[in-house]
């Protein structure tokens, strides 16, 4: 017979999905945020996004070229990192500083740890934190290019002491200050719908993260308006949809995803409500990224008929 059995080590591919197709879906889901940022902040938003993407792809290509490794840029993961990092900075961010964040994200966080699938934290997330710590003044310029916008709208909603002054419609549509990707909740929701519809991500993490934050704020403030304003403000929605759901740095079981989402809500609420820092999403995500291996271990599904080693040893000793 001419039939040959090809035996290879697991895992065996049982799906037509590839890294490239998954990343392509994420890019499509990010498009509403990119378009909304251009409408709200002007065409410079597109320049910031383009520079970030080109820098990430270039750094990945150059690193692999110098170390004579296979070129992975066709999987589009560097493009996703570039867009997400661009959506995490203000429109006036100096491009040179942004490129430093791209360098940290791609070379230090991603490639030095072995490339895609090996990073301990979300590359774009760490890049944002490095930019925030290193260039705080640039990262905190919450202004519209249009000088006609009033001061309340041009400030980030998290900086407004009286949340009753915040319009929920303005928060949902993005008529307020903030970084490029976090302002328009409508665009983020459209991206979420696409990702869930294409089964690129599970709704478990965004729902448990945002839902727990809403409940915590509702209990703390006794106000539905304040709780909704907290959910629609800052980087919560963008982080919950595009960063907390990262395949590498999030749990793989449903139970683990729910635990992860609620834990993110607890940490973010604690930082925002009791801490001196008005945001909290980035640091909460980084903190919980470190706990993902333990969450995976604790929530791992036990195969039917599995006997724990301690119990097996005890039974063997009794014979």
Predicted regions and their residues:
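N-terminal signal-anchor module of multipass membrane proteins
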Residues: 1-53, 57, 315-319
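Alpha-helical transmembrane segments in multi-pass membrane proteins
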Residues: 25-33, 48-60, 77-82, 86, ...
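Structural signature of hydrophobic alpha-helical transmembrane segments
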Residues: 42-55, 92-101, 171, 175-185, ...
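C-terminal ends of transmembrane helices
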Residues: 58-70, 106-118, 188-198, 241-250
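Membrane-interface helix-loop-helix junctions at boundaries between adjacent transmembrane segments
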Residues: 77-78, 83-149
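Long hydrophobic alpha-helical segments that form multi-pass transmembrane helix bundles
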Residues: 117-189
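Loop-to-transmembrane alpha-helix initiation sites
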Residues: 120, 124, 206, 228-236, ...
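Conserved mixed alpha/beta catalytic, RNA-binding, or beta-rich assembly cores of soluble enzyme
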Residues: 196-223
């Amino acid at each position: 017979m001419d039939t040959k059995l090809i035996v290879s080590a697991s895992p065996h591919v049982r799906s037509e999905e590839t890294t490239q197709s998954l990343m392509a879906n994420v890019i499509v889901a990010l498009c509403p945020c990119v378009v909304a940022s251009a409408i709200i902040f002007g065409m410079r938003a597109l320049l910031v996004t383009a520079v970030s993407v080109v820098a990430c792809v270039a750094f990945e290509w150059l690193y692999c070229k110098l170390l004579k490794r296979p070129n992975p840029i066709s999987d589009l993961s560097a493009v996703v990192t570039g867009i997400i990092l661009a959506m995490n900075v203000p429109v006036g961010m100096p491009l040179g500083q942004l490129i430093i964040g791209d360098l940290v994200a791609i070379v230090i966080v991603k490639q030095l740890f072995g490339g895609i699938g090996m990073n301990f934290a979300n590359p774009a997330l760490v890049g944002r934190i490095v930019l925030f710590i290193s260039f705080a003044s640039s990262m905190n310029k919450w202004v519209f290019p249009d000088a006609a916008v009033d001061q309340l709208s041009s400030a980030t909603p998290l900086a407004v002491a009286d949340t009753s002054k915040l319009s929920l419609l303005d928060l949902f549509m993005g008529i307020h200050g903030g970084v490029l990707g976090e302002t328009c909740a409508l665009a983020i929701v459209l991206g979420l719908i696409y990702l869930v519809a294409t089964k690129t991500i599970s709704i478990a993490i965004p729902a448990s993260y945002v839902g727990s934050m809403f409940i915590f704020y509702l209990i703390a403030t006794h106000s539905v308006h304040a709780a909704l304003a907290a959910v629609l403000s800052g980087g919560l929605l963008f982080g919950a949809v595009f960063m907390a759901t990262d395949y590498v740095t999030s749990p793989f079981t449903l139970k683990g995803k729910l635990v992860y989402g609620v834990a993110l809500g607890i940490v973010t609420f604690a930082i925002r409500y009791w801490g001196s820092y008005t945001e909290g999403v980035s640091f909460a995500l980084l903190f919980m990224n470190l706990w993902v291996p333990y969450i995976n271990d604790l929530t791992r599904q036990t195969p039917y008929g599995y006997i724990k080693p301690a119990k097996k040893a005890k039974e063997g000793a009794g014979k």
